[in-house]
């Protein structure tokens, strides 16, 4: 059985009248890359700060390897944090920045030298010891910040939107680099972001948050392919969402016709919501489609065209490598495995 390294139990946090975390529970496993994903104000950074000890919960318990650490100050917790603002010391070179925490602990110089060299090699900056941090690129500075956190050998590394200030290409490179570092070290990473691509690319587990609550927790594949509610479906990628009725196991009705699906376990004639991803819709001739509609707009997105279709007053979004002409009629085919059923939310 996989052991949890961090457990949050019934955590609540309020700022005056605002509830940031509401009876929040989360288990974080040893050696996993877990991402807290959600829009601004959902509580993800507050969760990270409570784990780090920079904020204290109003109610609930924080457990580290089974022991409560609610009142433990940050410097006594076996975690280190990397922020979007790297907070490097501009008057120090790379070596001095990375070694800073070890010097505070009065670590012997030969041990510091060995650890700094080892961690700079890990972040692919071997030989940069005497470079001034101001001479480094944004990506290199981010690696130094990560090296400074890792040199203390924490059991958990907390990362609060650390790639937000980087340009797209560098951000994508750092996503791969962070995952490589985490796998090599085998320690727990807890990563905070509002960027869905970052979460899907790097994570073993994604925790989707909204208004201080967990909406869904699972693998990237589970979160993307089987969203539990309309918030998750809309937040993770683009989605076509329609009201429907679950006629029986493996059969659903939406858009005024019956479809085969792969879902079961619903009540007969239960009101549900249907999610279909734009890339899962097959474009066919109008007479060959399960549904058909008129093209209202197309946009070139680089790797595909985004096509908007009006089907009996309902807006559909399709992604296809082939374009379609505005005003023409298209058919749509949808395979059973591409129809995802969600229970209707109680509003």
From Swiss-Prot:
The keyword Nucleotide-binding applies. The gene is potA. GO terms for molecular function: ABC-type putrescine transporter activity; ATP binding; ATP hydrolysis activity. Its EC number is 7.6.2.11. The keyword Glycoprotein does not apply. It is found in: Cell membrane. Keywords: ATP-binding, Cell membrane, Membrane, Nucleotide-binding, Translocase, Transport. Belongs to the ABC transporter superfamily. Spermidine/putrescine importer (TC 3.A.1.11.1) family. This is Spermidine/putrescine import ATP-binding protein PotA. It catalyses: ATP + H2O + polyamine-[polyamine-binding protein]Side 1 = ADP + phosphate + polyamineSide 2 + [polyamine-binding protein]Side 1. It is a peripheral membrane protein. One of its GO terms (cellular component) is ATP-binding cassette (ABC) transporter complex. ATP binds at residues 38-45. The complex is composed of two ATP-binding proteins (PotA), two transmembrane proteins (PotB and PotC) and a solute-binding protein (PotD).
